[in-house]
Amino acid sequence: MIKRIDRVNELIKQELSKLIGEYFKLKDILITVTRVKTEPDLRSAEAFISIFPFAKAEETLKQFKEILPRIQHILDGTIELKYIPKIQLFLDESLEYESNIERLLDKIKDSKMKH
């Protein structure tokens, strides 16, 4: 069952990424589906997206959630499963977290070089 869930996760991730590219084009904003976690009963799935630049993430996520019903409807027609999971969107903040860690490490490195 786990392998099936993994395949469903990957399928939803690919289809969602494709639909984002087709229906959600914003200038100077990059949206990436980083992972999908589908429940074992296939009734719901959490999709995590990263948005760059991060400063526009909340606003962009809000806009994306507004068109999610349309994207869900399209997914219902393109994915061949008995049940198409209902997608919930979440902001994946891990890339921003990593970026902050790198900035802090760079500051420490710079301060050590100055002393």
What are these regions (language model features)?
Residues 1-44, 50-115:
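Charge-rich, low-complexity N-terminal segments
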